[in-house]
Structures are given as structure tokens and as C-alpha cells.
Amino acid sequence: MLHIRIVAVGKLKEKYLKEGLREYIKRLGAYSRLEIIEVPDEKVPDKPSDTEAALIKRKEGDRLLAAAGDKDYIGVALDPRGEMWSTEDLADKMRRWELYGPNLVVFFIGGTLGLSKEVHAVCKAKWSLSRLTFPHQLVRLILLEQVYRGCKVNRGETYHR
């Protein structure tokens, strides 16, 4: 069984997102071992300088990496500049990760300014969910839905489209 750890910046606040996450966590229980770890975000000024932005991303990145824990994992950075994957691509990657290991996959979700270069450096893949921009809190729900869909594909089960 694949072990999935989602490490995200910021605390989920919206009730509708929390409810959606609970639903997919429940559904995924039959397919994988799942952990979601939230790390504190930094206060971002309205117009941060490049230096301020880099420092904020570095602090948040250090927290993400500490929360990721075990070094023996496949890191996946969720990044709008990453590679676009279809559902079938994700299902195939999940199948290979489970078969060939390491059996832990860590998905990194950055804060408002994105992920630090240090987080990107430990990631074997950079995945863009869409060319659209989503709030980083909504990305958690989209990610869980896609992981659930990938699990269903890998088991040959139907999923409403």
C-alpha cells in the first residue's frame, strides 16, 4: 500500500474545504496510508521585495522539509510551472512508486509565494495541476481528488466522470 504524505503551508480555514478533505481522506483509507501535515505560513507583505519573498519562501520551505521527515521518499512539488499530468499519468506514476519504491511519496504544497528552491531541490518531480492559478488551500482538495481517482484507475474500478 502506497504511503502518501501531503505537507502544506498554512492551516485550512474554510469549512467547505475541510469537509471535502475529510470525505477524500475517508475514501482514500481503503487505498493508501495518508498523512496531511500543515506547517505555519509566514505573513506576506502586500508587495514583498525579491529579498523578502525569498526569505519567506526559505522559512516556509525549511518547515516543509522538516515536516516531510524521512529522507527516503519521492518528493513531488506542486508548482504551476511543473509538468502537466493526466489522470492516467498520475495513476501510472503511483503504480510505479508503489512497486519500485521508496513506498513514501511526499507532495509539497507551498504558500502564497510558492515553494523554495531548497524544496524543489529534493523533489524528483514537479507537477502542475493546471495552468490556472488556484488558492494553495484549494490545491489540497484537488490533489486528494486526483490521488483518489488514480487509486481507482489502478484498481480497475469505475469513477464517475
Swiss-Prot record:
GO cellular component: cytoplasm
Pfam family, one: SPOUT_MTase
EC number(s) recorded for this UniProt protein: 2.1.1.177
Keywords linked to the UniProt accession: Cytoplasm, Methyltransferase, rRNA processing, S-adenosyl-L-methionine, Transferase
Sequence positions that bind S-adenosyl-L-methionine: L78, G110, L129, S130, R131, L132, T133, F134
InterPro entries: Alpha/beta_knot_MTases, RlmH-like, tRNA_m1G_MTases_N
Enzyme class: transferase
Catalytic reactions of this protein: pseudouridine(1915) in 23S rRNA + S-adenosyl-L-methionine = N(3)-methylpseudouridine(1915) in 23S rRNA + S-adenosyl-L-homocysteine + H(+)
Subcellular location: Cytoplasm
Subunit text: Homodimer.
Function: Specifically methylates the pseudouridine at position 1915 (m3Psi1915) in 23S rRNA.
Name assigned to this protein: Ribosomal RNA large subunit methyltransferase H
Organism name: Heliobacterium modesticaldum (strain ATCC 51547 / Ice1)
Gene: rlmH
